[in-house]
Amino acid sequence: MLLEIRAAIPEDASVACQVMRRSIAELCVADHRNDEAILKRWLSNKTPEVFGSWIRQPDNSLLVAVEGGKILAVGSVTDAGQITLNYVSPDARFRGVSRALVGALEARAMERGNTRCTLTSTETARRFYLASGYVEDGLPVGNFGTSSGYPMSKLLASHDA
């Protein structure tokens, strides 16, 4: 089947939130260590209501990766080039879905005039981003009670253009 990456719509909210919540709970154990307090904080804004507000933000691009009508991943990038979300369904891990979604997020950032993207990676995704051309941009920072948020950036285009 063909993977389609498109702008999220309000009707995606419920399923997209399930994808994000499963991704965090099942794939990010190295980050939350099954600590209920950390999980509760991390999952607290992964609701259909908050998802709807992300869609409506004028300086934000919220994308979904869809295959056969099923949402497999959710990603977001601000107009300033900051990737704020990149979650893949555990059912779609290691199939190139996250790589395709990050490529679309980077393309959107470039459309907005950015020459680099920034993000804060989880421990779980750190090797993925390094393999995707990102470099670490500082000391780890705490996220949701963890100490495993890694500031990273990637040059997208030449500053000499």
Where are the model-predicted features located?
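Acetyl-CoA-dependent GNAT
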Residues: A7-P10, Q18-R93, V102-A104, R108, ...
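Conserved N-terminal entry element of GNAT/NAT acetyltransferase domains
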Residues: M1-S14, A157-A161
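Conserved active-site tyrosine of GNAT-family acetyltransferases
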Residues: Y129, Y134
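Conserved catalytic-core motifs of GNAT/GCN5-like acyltransferases
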Residues: T118-T120, V135-P151
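Glycine-rich phosphate-binding loop
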Residues: G96
